[in-house]
């Protein structure tokens, strides 16, 4: 399949540079199968959820993963922590005029000292000195890594708004953005209606922003991310399916975690590990019936995922509609509700 099949024209002014003034006030495009497109607001989501449905949220927490400093040799350096390996060791992307060599010392803001001890592919392995953990050092001295299409520096407002209200476990370098729309009040309304909430963890990596650089998408190599599906979530999903209820994936990261855990048998099983699952049209979904998601970049792997879920023609029409009505796109943008359209590649 050609990458051009997933291209579309997006006016630059539709790329949201800031969150909405009030969390949860975004627009919601309801694009369910066999229904006309509907313009709603995100607070209307419970209208489409039935008692007994299960909504699966990604509880990852965005790290303040960006560090600025210099090498012992004096050159400037920027590190983006991709994955924390243990309390004092992490893998990082490095930007510098010259790549640091093994054994080279690095000094970051706040007096943080680290040594570059090796490499894993394109990533640099950093060993941090001192008694504080990597997470503690980042929380005190790091900067929130906003996506590259947000053309401004992170500010104090982003510290809360680029984080879901249910975030628990540090490890992500990008937010699971569909979850940014949910408020505590909306979660209460869903539970009051009889919906069941469940959680997975998928630590979103910087690879989520990597462009697809091949013409044939089958040749693309997907990045790897760590995920976990707890036994409680697997049980809640299986129970919902047994009673005929729907399973909602809140965001593409929740979807990738669920599908990764169900890939071996076709049924959701508890588990954890690394996943490089690449979902493209023709993929047969095993778990979710509904997907809550933001609007994605042209030619992106996430646009391929939603096209696989709801059908390429359906997504093209929905995106064309959203552009015409000036929905806001990407991380701080508006959201949509999609339904699974079995076996459709159009």
UniProtKB/Swiss-Prot annotation:
Quaternary organization: Monomer.
Pathway field: tRNA modification; tRNA-queuosine biosynthesis
Assigned EC number: 2.4.99.17
Similarity comment text for this entry: Belongs to the QueA family.
Role played: Transfers and isomerizes the ribose moiety from AdoMet to the 7-aminomethyl group of 7-deazaguanine (preQ1-tRNA) to give epoxyqueuosine (oQ-tRNA).
Keywords of this entry: Cytoplasm, Queuosine biosynthesis, S-adenosyl-L-methionine, Transferase
Record's catalysed reaction(s): 7-aminomethyl-7-carbaguanosine(34) in tRNA + S-adenosyl-L-methionine = epoxyqueuosine(34) in tRNA + adenine + L-methionine + 2 H(+)
Main location group: cytoplasm
Localization terms from the record: Cytoplasm
GO molecular function per UniProt: S-adenosylmethionine:tRNA ribosyltransferase-isomerase activity
Listed InterPro entries: QueA (IPR003699), QueA_dom1 (IPR042118), QueA_dom2 (IPR042119), QueA_sf (IPR036100)
Top enzyme class: transferase
Gene3D superfamilies with a match to the protein in the record: QueA-like (3.40.1780.10)
Gene Ontology CC terms: cytoplasm
GO terms (BP aspect): queuosine biosynthetic process; tRNA wobble guanine modification
Protein name (record): S-adenosylmethionine:tRNA ribosyltransferase-isomerase
């Amino acid at each position: 399949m050609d990458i051009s099949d997933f291209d579309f024209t997006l006016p630059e002014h539709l790329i949201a540079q800031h969150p909405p003034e009030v969390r949860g006030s975004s627009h919601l495009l309801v694009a369910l199968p066999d229904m006309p497109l509907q313009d709603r607001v995100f607070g209307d989501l419970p209208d489409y959820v039935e008692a007994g449905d299960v909504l699966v949220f990604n509880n990852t927490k965005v790290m303040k993963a960006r560090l600025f400093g210099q090498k012992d040799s004096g050159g400037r350096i920027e590190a983006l922590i991709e994955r924390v390996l243990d309390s004092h060791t992490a893998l990082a992307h490095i930007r510098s005029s010259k790549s640091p060599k093994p054994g080279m010392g690095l000094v970051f803001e706040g007096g943080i000292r680290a040594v570059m001890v090796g490499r894993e592919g394109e990533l640099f392995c950093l060993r941090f000195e001192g008694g504080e953990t990597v997470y503690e050092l980042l929380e005190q001295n790091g900067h929130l890594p906003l996506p590259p299409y947000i053309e401004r520096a992170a500010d104090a407002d982003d510290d809360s708004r680029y984080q879901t209200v249910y975030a628990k476990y540090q490890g992500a370098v990008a937010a699971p953005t569909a979850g940014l729309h949910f408020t505590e009040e909306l979660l209460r309304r869903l539970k009051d209606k009889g919906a069941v909430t469940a959680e997975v963890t998928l630590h979103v990596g910087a690879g989520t922003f990597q462009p697809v650089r091949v013409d044939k998408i089958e040749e693309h190599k997907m990045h790897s991310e760590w995920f976990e599906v707890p036994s409680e979530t697997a049980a809640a999903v299986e129970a919902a399916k047994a009673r005929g209820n729907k399973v909602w994936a809140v965001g593409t990261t929740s979807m990738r975690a669920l599908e990764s855990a169900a890939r071996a048998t076709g049924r959701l099983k508890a588990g954890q590990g690394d996943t490089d699952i690449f979902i493209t049209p023709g993929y047969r979904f095993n778990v979710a019936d509904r997907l809550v998601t933001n609007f994605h970049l042209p030619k992106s792997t996430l646009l391929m995922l939603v096209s696989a879920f709801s059908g390429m023609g359906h997504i093209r029409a929905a995106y064309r509609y959203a552009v015409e009505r000036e929905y806001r796109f990407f991380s701080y943008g508006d959201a949509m509700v999609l339904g699974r359209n079995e076996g459709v590649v159009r």
